[in-house]
A protein has these predicted regions:
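Acidic/His- and Gly-rich active-site-bordering loop/insert found
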Residues: 2-103
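Conserved small/polar residues in nucleotide/adenosyl-binding loops
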Residues: 106-108
Length: 108
């Protein structure tokens, strides 16, 4: 797969996922308080057919999103952070991780 093919494949999702990243950036919720950021990500994944399990490891804003294809193929996982730094905001770039992971998931 070449660079141009990838650009064409992701183009339909770029506006909404960029908007998602911007919303998470604006919220700038610190660790363990990213309630709205978590909801943005899980709502989107739920609409794409993922089963959502919230409160993973007794962390209220942590979640697992599972997409079953039923073909017995391999399983894999992705990790995204979406917390901000207190008083600084998203200087860490975590606002981009969730939307980037979602883009990867859509294309697997």
């Amino acid at each position: 797969m070449n660079k141009e093919t990838i650009k064409q494949a992701v183009a339909p999702y770029m506006a909404e996922l960029t908007q998602m990243a911007d919303r998470i950036y604006d919220l700038a919720e610190p660790g363990l308080e990213e309630v709205r950021s978590s909801a943005i990500l899980t709502d989107y994944l739920g609409k794409k057919g993922f089963q959502i399990e919230r409160g993973i490891a007794d962390l209220p804003t942590a979640f697992r999103a599972v997409y079953e294809q039923g073909n017995g193929g391999p399983s894999f996982g992705f990790l995204a952070e979406y917390d901000a730094l207190k008083g600084i905001g998203h200087a860490c770039g975590h606002h981009m991780q969730g939307p980037s992971v979602i883009l990867s998931l859509i294309h697997i």
